[in-house]
Amino acid sequence: ETLHKIDKGVLPTVCKENRDPKVFWHEKSGAYIMTLWLEENDFGIFRSTDLLKWEQTDRLTFKEAWECPDLVCLKDEKGNETWMFWSADGFYFWGEFDGYQFQTDGVRHAAYINKIAYAAQTYSNTGNRVISVPWLRFPNRGRNYTGAMGLPREFSVAYKNGEKVLRQEPVREYEDSRKPVYDNTMKNVRQQDTENEALMADTAAKVADEHVSAKDLFQWKFAPDTATEIQITRAESEDILSARINQKTDFVYNAKTGELKIGEETFVTDAGIRDFSLLFDDVILEMTADCGTITDI
């Protein structure tokens, strides 16, 4: 069917500054569902069969969560479904949804290990995939705009130590677009590749991403018309992986302790992580680790 814009709102004010509606079709209960931030840490769930008349069916309070709610159904590798309620800071809550109410234990989980990503949105009409894009809160000093959009990521469910966690991997289209710039041992960078062709299909963005699992030092420039130099080092004796942009260390991971340093901030993650994907684009570094269960920007 075709949607037509009408000249007035369809949902009266519930709370003074309620905002950020997200609407989706819930097939099992045969209705459109709207999630809405109401006030403070309160959210509402509304339903409608015609997008005109809406009924509030639930009101939820989530500690420290606010703005930009979303409610999505995710699957694990075996196809088991779980519903997830999402808020602007990347706080998420597991539960079950019947088209009317969201039943949850109220335990808050964090999708990101820092506070740069914000207000992520998922998209409709993506088949069985749940794809999310956040806004990145960067000052962009010296430029006439603030922030940037983050890498599109596909959401699914994973398990760590028996606990359910959110997996957010870069979308498969991105993975399919990568081009290798070094050999299997990573001892020799093929300079011709880095000078004569873009590392990714999107040459304008000058994006480079490679999985890191080597013992040797290598470095490259994105393209001859940029001044960005990336250097990645793995110190085998200390079991430390580090990445530098333009001679400034932006990323250090200690596999023995699980300590992860991003810029000036230090976080404690799992020890012994062996899979990392690092994406560099201009001044932005996006990291994905441990099969998509750890994300930092």
Question: Residues of each region from the PLM?
Answer:
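Conserved beta-propeller blade signature
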Residues: 33-35, 82-86, 131-133
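Short, solvent-exposed loop/turn segments at conserved positions within beta-propeller repeat blades
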Residues: 37-41, 86-87, 145-148
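Beta-rich accessory regions
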Residues: 100-115, 124-297
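Surface loop/turn signatures of beta-propeller and other carbohydrate-active proteins
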Residues: 1-25, 36-37, 54-73, 103-120, ...
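Residue-level detector of Asp-centered blade-edge/turn motifs that repeat once per structural unit
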Residues: 25-30, 73-79, 125-128
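A short loop-to-beta-strand structural motif that recurs across blades of beta-propeller domains
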Residues: 42-44, 91
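Loop/turn-rich, solvent-exposed surfaces of beta-rich toroidal or solenoidal domains
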Residues: 70-94
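Conserved Ser/Thr-centered positions that define the repeating blades of beta-propeller domains
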Residues: 1, 45-48, 96
